[in-house]
Amino acid sequence: MKSNKTIFLILLFLINFNSIYSFNFKKEIKISNDKINLPTYNPWIFQDRFNLYSILINSTNIPVFGEDNSNNCLHGLQLQFEWQNRSGRLEINQGHVNTKSWWGDMNYYLSIIPYLSAMKMGLVPVVEIVSINDQRFCSTYEDCDQEVLNNWDNFFQQIINIRNNGSEGDDQQLLKFMWTAHIGSIDKATKLFTDSLLLLPKNELRFGNGWAHFVDVIATVNFNTNYSTVYHLGQQLPPIMLNSNDTHPSSIESFTKEQRNVVLTMYEINDLSSNNLVWNSFMYLLKKMTKNEICRNLINNEINIFLNSPVPTIIEILFDILTNNC
């Protein structure tokens, strides 16, 4: 009897032990497996970062972007990244983007940050982003700058709202949210990566800084960064990095006339932006004038003409519009 009672108590203990502990054990295994099975992307491998762009673009298609999604304003980010690679600006070695590349560093805030935001909003698949030992390159939503993320959250929320409402969407409204997020990313990245900017050759630095400020100009007029527009622009951009001898773009024989004009324009914008008072006054006037629809369309038209067939006098043209025509 005593033996049977002992066996019974042992069995009862084992049953209770199993019910109490095995569930938690299985849960731990499940969580562990989920983490193991997450697709992993290394943002410092060019193809991985490029693929994240593709996922992001394909996952944000809405009617206003067209049946082929070519009007999606996120195409511009991927096409720019492709140009940066093609022109050697990512300083790729065996498929890896150089972590000291200013262009690659800046692009991180226009690729990984938007993806983490879209992932948080449930628009794209959950993935694991490989991190490096540098806190400037956050790899989880929680670790990233919340103000920068909030701007992207607002943009992606617009896409979610359009889908939920079953409407086509307003591309101008979407562009406003996209540009707010875009400028927020650039402003944050510009402050973080002055060290890698200073590693660039003098004239590449002038070009890069001018380019970053030119984005402020095209954002003001709600420029559409869809596939066809940015693809065409990519043909006008310098195909290689600039060196210390490229002070005068007209002397760069391997560049087309349009490419020389783009470089010259970015040099001018760099020089203009070096004087904060002058640049801030210019941007203030530009933003003020673009509130007028006629002025905004006029300025937008000139910028589109420039991007399709660059001329070396776009800044003078804009100043003329701002001071005389509006």
UniProtKB/Swiss-Prot annotation:
Keyword Protein biosynthesis: no
Record-linked Pfam families: Leg1 (PF05612)
Signal sequence range: 1-22
InterPro entries: Leg1 (IPR008499)
Keywords (A to Z) from UniProt: Glycoprotein, Secreted, Signal
Protease among keywords: no
Positions glycosylated per UniProt: 58, 85, 165, 226, 245
GO-annotated cellular components: extracellular space
Major site of localization recorded for this protein: secreted
Localization per record: Secreted
Family: Belongs to the LEG1 family.
PANTHER family according to UniProt: LEG1, PROTEIN LEG1 HOMOLOG
UniProt protein name: Protein LEG1 homolog
Organism: Dictyostelium discoideum
Organism taxonomic ancestry: Eukaryota, Amoebozoa, Evosea, Eumycetozoa, Dictyostelia
